[in-house]
Amino acid sequence: MQKVALVTGAGQGIGKAIALRLVKDGFAVAIADYNDATATAVAAEINQAGGRAVAIKVDVSRRDQVFAAVEQARKALGGFNVIVNNAGIAPSTPIESITEEIVDRVYNINVKGVIWGMQAAVEAFKKEGHGGKIVNACSQAGHVGNPELAVYSSSKFAVRGLTQTAARDLAPLGITVNGFCPGIVKTPMWAEIDRQCRKRRANRWATARLNLPNASPLAACRSLKTSPPACRSSPARIPTI
């Protein structure tokens, strides 16, 4: 039976690259994104190439929508085995410019979105009668704070902690939980960060070069062990690329 994965934020960038990699590895994939048009385009690209995918519009900050998206994927694709909680935002926020609105928006998407995704996946795994795999997008910014990204960095520190804790909580259920930590990747999100910062502080970043999105699926799909043998443990690995 074909395995099923749902990837949030899969309409572009790293999320799209992960979805394409999963399809290459034999998965049917739910392309979940806030932007319905980009999700539909990615799903169409996969289906036209002989893969199997569905597009699902979802606002990951809304718990009810995340649960509905996972259930839709489970029914449409005939099962549920993996969720990749990849969706996130990274507004430029120097300390003195942080507002309550920015904090709420970033944490609602980057942190709550991961929590809702993990909860929805656990529910789906239980319905399917087996364990499964949860993969959360962390970041190098979740290890070392980066200038002008205080709120984003702190949200990724939170995701890192959630991932390590969930790995221990869910291991008895046969559910593995891991994270992957990309550095600066050439994606639309990074282009927006760069636009906001105007490169004026580029020399302060820990990583100077831009990685390509196709590097991240290797961390998300290989280092995080989405293959069957990984069911024996839940190491909460958080590789940095």
From Swiss-Prot:
<feature type="active site">
    <location>
        <position position="156"/>
    </location>
</feature>
<feature type="active site" description="Proton acceptor">
    <location>
        <position position="152"/>
    </location>
</feature>
<feature type="binding site">
    <location>
        <position position="139"/>
    </location>
    <ligand>
        <name>substrate</name>
    </ligand>
</feature>
<dbReference type="InterPro" id="IPR014007">
    <property type="entry name" value="23BDH"/>
</dbReference>
<protein>
    <recommendedName>
        <fullName>Diacetyl reductase [(S)-acetoin forming]</fullName>
        <ecNumber>1.1.1.304</ecNumber>
    </recommendedName>
</protein>
<keyword id="KW-0560">Oxidoreductase</keyword>
<dbReference type="Pfam" id="PF00106">
    <property type="entry name" value="adh_short"/>
</dbReference>
<comment type="similarity">
    <text>Belongs to the short-chain dehydrogenases/reductases (SDR) family.</text>
</comment>
<dbReference type="GO" id="GO:0052588">
    <property type="term" value="F:diacetyl reductase ((S)-acetoin forming) (NAD+) activity"/>
</dbReference>
<comment type="function">
    <text>Catalyzes the irreversible reduction of 2,3-butanediol to (S)-acetoin in the presence of NADH.</text>
</comment>
<feature type="binding site">
    <location>
        <begin position="6"/>
        <end position="30"/>
    </location>
    <ligand>
        <name>NAD(+)</name>
    </ligand>
</feature>
<keyword id="KW-0520">NAD</keyword>
<dbReference type="InterPro" id="IPR020904">
    <property type="entry name" value="Sc_DH/Rdtase_CS"/>
</dbReference>
<dbReference type="InterPro" id="IPR002347">
    <property type="entry name" value="SDR_fam"/>
</dbReference>
<dbReference type="GO" id="GO:0045150">
    <property type="term" value="P:acetoin catabolic process"/>
</dbReference>
<dbReference type="InterPro" id="IPR036291">
    <property type="entry name" value="NAD(P)-bd_dom_sf"/>
</dbReference>
<comment type="subunit">
    <text>Homotetramer.</text>
</comment>
